[in-house]
């Protein structure tokens, strides 16, 4: 009963170092799971949150394919033409570097069009968010902002990027971050 507003089909997120054969097998498995997830979501037993939610849940499909453009193309086609979800997430391995991640996102996002919201999985660095919104990404999720907050850091605008609010200089500071 977490009351999530946006939920995702079940998938496998492959690590960046797996080969194309494994990535393709994983993508096909994720597509089968997506179909099962959608069928369950649309079933008469559909989960209806009672609290913690702004309303009806929305299901997102997930584009897989790792760094391989032909696999991404196939997964884009699956998500746009074989299943019908509220939105589409870009998932799976986005590469082993920021450059590869930007290449994968900039290849994938424009092909998804603007009919559905586009979500990017696992990216939470503020610089990446600003850059990737310009590429057509609507929403993001990542554990890093929450993890930083648990350890006393707050993300802030500007070159510094974050501030450790546990530092002694802030112990009596009641001003806005």
For the regions a protein language model found, what residue spans apply to each?
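Non-catalytic, usually N-terminal nucleic-acid engagement modules in DNA/RNA processing proteins
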Residues: 1-53, 168-169, 177
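Glycine-rich phosphate/ribose-binding loops and adjacent secondary-structure elements
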Residues: 28-31, 44, 48, 54, ...
């Amino acid at each position: 009963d977490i009351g999530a507003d946006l939920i995702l089909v079940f998938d496998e997120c492959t690590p960046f170092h797996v080969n194309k054969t494994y990535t393709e097998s994983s993508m096909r498995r994720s597509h089968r799971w997506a179909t099962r997830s959608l069928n369950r979501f649309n079933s008469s037993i559909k989960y209806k949150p009672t609290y913690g939610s702004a309303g009806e849940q929305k299901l997102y499909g997930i584009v897989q394919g790792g760094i391989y453009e032909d696999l991404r193309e196939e997964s884009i086609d699956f998500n746009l033409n074989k299943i019908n979800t509220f939105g589409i997430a870009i998932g799976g391995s986005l590469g082993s570097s920021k450059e590869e991640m930007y290449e994968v996102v900039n290849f994938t996002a424009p092909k998804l069009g603007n009919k559905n919201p586009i979500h990017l999985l696992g990216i939470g660095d503020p610089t990446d968010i600003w850059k990737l919104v310009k590429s057509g990404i609507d929403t993001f999720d990542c554990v890093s902002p929450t993890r930083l907050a648990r350890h006393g850091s707050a993300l802030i605008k500007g070159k510094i990027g974050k501030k450790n609010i546990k530092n002694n200089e802030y112990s009596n500071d009641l001003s806005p971050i």
